[in-house]
Regions:
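Acidic (Asp/Glu)-rich catalytic clusters
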Residues: 112-120, 137-154
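Short beta-strand and adjacent tight-turn residues that come in two discontinuous sequence segments
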Residues: 125, 155, 215-217
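Charged helix-capping and loop-helix junction motifs
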Residues: 135-142, 169-173
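Short histidine/acidic/glycine/proline-rich micro-motifs that form metal-
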Residues: 128-132, 161, 195-198
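Histidine-centered catalytic micro-motifs
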Residues: 38-39, 151-159
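Acidic, polar ligand-binding/catalytic clefts
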Residues: 96, 108-113, 122
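C-terminal active-site subregion of NodB/CE4 polysaccharide deacetylases
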Residues: 2-4, 11-15, 19-99, 105-106, ...
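Short, glycine/acidic-enriched loop or turn micro-motifs at the edges of active sites
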Residues: 104-105, 158
Length: 286
C-alpha cells in the first residue's frame, strides 16, 4: 500500500497509473509465436476521392516490401499455411502473408509487378460481382496473377457484411462467389476474407461446409498452426503518415495484440468476456 501511495503522490492521475499497469501486464506476457498477415486495399496515386485512408502510395509500399525483405520475412499464401497445418509443407523461419481486399485494378497494374520484381507472393480477395467493372480487375488479370504465383480468394459475391444477412443469403454469398471463380477456370478457392471483418459462429461453420480452408478477420494478432484457420488475425496497413516508422508500429501492434490474447486466456471467463466485448466495440468504432 505504501508503494501505491507513493505513486499516487507523484501527481499522476489514477487512470494513467492503471493504464500503465495494464500495459505492463500485457507486455510482460510470454512472447507469442506466430506470423503476421498484412491487410491492404489499394496501392496507387492519386487516391480515389474518399478512399484516401485505404490507399498506400507506391513508393511507400515499395519501402514496406523492402523492409520486410531486409528483416528476413518470406511471403507465403493462405494455402501454404493450410498445407503446413496438415503437415504437408514446412513454413519458412519468418513468414508473412500479404493480403489485398476488394480486387481493385491497381492490384494488377501496380502491385503485381512490384511483387514479381522482388520474388514475393500474396493473396488477393475479390468480390466476384465487381470483376470487370471500372476500377476493378478483369478475369484476364486474375488468370495472369495466378500464373504469377499469387493466390486468389473470395471476398463474397457482393461485399455485404455477412452478419446483416439471413443464413440462406450468407450461404449464397459464400457458395456463389467460390463457384463463379472456379467455374471461370481459376484454381480451387480455399481462402476467404470477411467483408468489413464481420462474422459469427454460424458463418464460420458455413465456411467449413463450403470447403474453404482459411478465412481472415480484421482483428490484429499473430498466427500459427494452433490458430483457428477461419479466424486468422490481420493487421490493417492504411495510408501512412509517418513512413516506415508507422509501418514498424503496425507490425508491433500484431505482437502486442497476440500478447493480449495470451493474457486474456489467463483470466476468469466473466472478466475475459467483458474485455473481449469492449475490444469488439472499440474495433467497430475505428
Amino acid at each position: 500500500m505504501r508503494g501505491i501511495a507513493r505513486r499516487l503522490s507523484s501527481g499522476l492521475p489514477l487512470p494513467v497509473l492503471l493504464l500503465a499497469a495494464f500495459a505492463a501486464w500485457i507486455l510482460t506476457a510470454t512472447p507469442p509465436t506466430g506470423f503476421p498477415i498484412l491487410e491492404y486495399h489499394m496501392v496507387t496515386e492519386p487516391p480515389r476521392p474518399g478512399a484516401e485512408p485505404y490507399v498506400v502510395p507506391p513508393e511507400e509500399f515499395a519501402a514496406q516490401l523492402d523492409y520486410l525483405a531486409a528483416e528476413g520475412y518470406t511471403t507465403i499464401t493462405p494455402q501454404d499455411y493450410a498445407r503446413a497445418r496438415k503437415g504437408k509443407q514446412e513454413l519458412p523461419e519468418k513468414p508473412v502473408i500479404l493480403s489485398f481486399d476488394d480486387g481493385y485494378e491497381d492490384n494488377y497494374r501496380v502491385i503485381l509487378p512490384m511483387l514479381k520484381e522482388r520474388g514475393m507472393k500474396a493473396v488477393f480477395y475479390v468480390v466476384t460481382n465487381d470483376i470487370g467493372l471500372p476500377g476493378y480487375m478483369t478475369w484476364d488479370n486474375l488468370f495472369d496473377m495466378e500464373r504469377s504465383g499469387m493466390e486468389i480468394g473470395s471476398h463474397t459475391a457482393n461485399h455485404i457484411p455477412l452478419t446483416t444477412l439471413p443464413p440462406e443469403k450468407q450461404r449464397e454469398e459464400l457458395h456463389l462467389s467460390k463457384l463463379m471463380l472456379e467455374w471461370k477456370g481459376l484454381k480451387t478457392i480455399y481462402s476467404f476474407s470477411y467483408p468489413t471483418g464481420a462474422y459469427d459462429d454460424g458463418i464460420v461453420a458455413m465456411l467449413a461446409e463450403e470447403d474453404y480452408l482459411t478465412a481472415v478477420t480484421g482483428e490484429a494478432g499473430l498466427n500459427n498452426v494452433e490458430t483457428n484457420p477461419y479466424l486468422l488475425h490481420r493487421v490493417n496497413i492504411p495510408r501512412p503518415h509517418f513512413g516506415l516508422t508507422e509501418f514498424r508500429m503496425r507490425l508491433m501492434k500484431a505482437d502486442i495484440a497476440a500478447r493480449l490474447h495470451v493474457r486474456l486466456a489467463q483470466l476468469p471467463d466473466g472478466v475475459r468476456e467483458g474485455i473481449t466485448h469492449l475490444r469488439t466495440l472499440l474495433h467497430g468504432n475505428q
